[in-house]
Amino acid sequence: MTVSPRLQNLVSWDSDWAGLRVAVTGIGVSGFAAADTLIELGARVVVVDAATSDTARAQADTLKIVGAVDVLLGEEAVNRIPKIDGGFPELIVTSPGWRPDQALLAAAARAHIPVWGDVELAWRLRVRAGHKTADWLTITGTNGKTTTVGLTASMLQAAGLKAIAVGNVGTPILDALRDPVEYDAFAVELSSFQLHWAESLSPVASVCLNVAEDHVDWHGSYNSYLADKAKVYARTQKACIFNAEQIETERMVEDADVIEGCRAVGVTTLTPAISMLGVVEGLLVDRAFIEERKDSAAELASMSDLGQFAPRHMVANALAAAALVRAYGVDAKAVRQGIQDYVPGNHRIQPVAKQNGVLWVNDSKATNPHAAAASLATFENVIWIAGGLSKGVSYDHLVRDNAARLKAVVLIGTDTAALADALQRHAPDVPVITTPAGDTENMQTAATGGAITGSSPDSGAAVMSRAVASAAQLAASGDTVLMAPAAASMDQFSSYAHRGDAFIDAVRELVEGQAQTGEE
């Protein structure tokens, strides 16, 4: 696609954005931030979204007040390219969840209208006269992104730097750019969706933590998904960090077009080779960013610094974060302090309760088989609550590799056929209970051009309450009830957090009831 000279020259906050006709697709968190920013820059902005909820209408009213040309809501609004001041947009800025084959975006491709994501827009706005320009450390991967981003920001802060975690989850990067705080560095979480719409990022250091089959429905194929993940390494300045235990990420680095002088640095949960970070006798060590790396290693932290649970994937995340900040010049002491200061987010292998010898664990963030495998590997004698929207993935490897640790399975969700079939093939002796879906509706996702709408909180809570009750009947002292769904949540919940909160509420209600009745 030929890009107009005007768009090519939009490389800073101080470039000529005034009067630029821009359509923003999506009125959610990232779409709202993009529209608000572009309006501030003087662009002529029209926003479209399929949603017609009260929240969407309130967002629309706000954008109109601050200067949007128009905000168009409803299904018709997202099926065609909107006109702006009588002409087509010169640029479309899309929210990450919108698929390339969505009607409006497909029409834009046919009309040769450039499409950026919010991250691409943020990169082009990062330089601003009279303001500090924050450096970017970028993180992607099928799993572990949010944890690694949080650890990276914590380590940077422990080194005395002004840093913040931004991107796919948490603070929208455009909001961070406009924050009165002048940051030294951003720890940027990038989804495959965001990378798909990014073309010019050049981070100081970058990492793809891991890859596994995920979002095939969005990308069209696993190879397309890998290609978008690999874009995290493009134009990296100092260090491309890869998972030395997964050849796909190393190949991404080998194929990346990087800035001259950029290094390839591996991370492993095993003993590290030269130019790697890894683990030696319970210590996290660095053999990459030290002078005498040929025959020595720098101690960064101990396994105990990672807390009560230090599953293998958590160790890998900490090592990846350490590699990023070490590439940025952070010392070993700050790495340890950052790990100790880090508070893990909810819904990530989160112990909820222990009653009558049964441990209840919430890992609602495990939205695909790869994440669920890491969670299952942490425990034995598991009653597994799983299911949801499968996103077109296979469950055969997950079930086959973990069948021996499964005591029983409680299925939730409206799209459980693939998981149920895998259980029948590879764990035929494991009892499986299917929780009725009840009156829940399918949630509408941004892939169709809309903000999430649909199912009521009460219906999701009822499903989870039934699942928890079923698990309680199966569990005995020494067992773990693990909610690690291996699927997306939008069939019965508004988000993985909503699903996790429903699990927590149901478990606490169960435990309180057992305590009051003296049930053993």
Tell what function each PLM region has.
Residues 13, 39-40, 79-89, 96-263, ...:
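Phosphate-binding loop of NTP-binding sites
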Residues 49, 72-75, 116-121, 166, ...:
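Beta-strand->loop->alpha-helix junctions that form or flank phosphate-binding loops
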Residues 38, 92, 139, 168, ...:
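Residue-level signal for inorganic ion chemistry
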Residues 44-49, 164-165, 187, 266, ...:
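Short beta-strand "acidic-cap" motif of Rossmann-like dinucleotide-binding folds
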Residues 1-121, 513:
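N-terminal leader/targeting and accessory segments in enzymes
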Residues 6-7, 13-21, 33-41, 301-406, ...:
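Nucleotide phosphate-binding/pyrophosphate-handling subdomain across enzymes
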Residues 59-61, 66-69, 399-479, 518-520:
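C-terminal helical cap/extension that packs against the catalytic core
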Residues 43-52, 241-244, 385-386, 405-415:
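Short internal beta-strands
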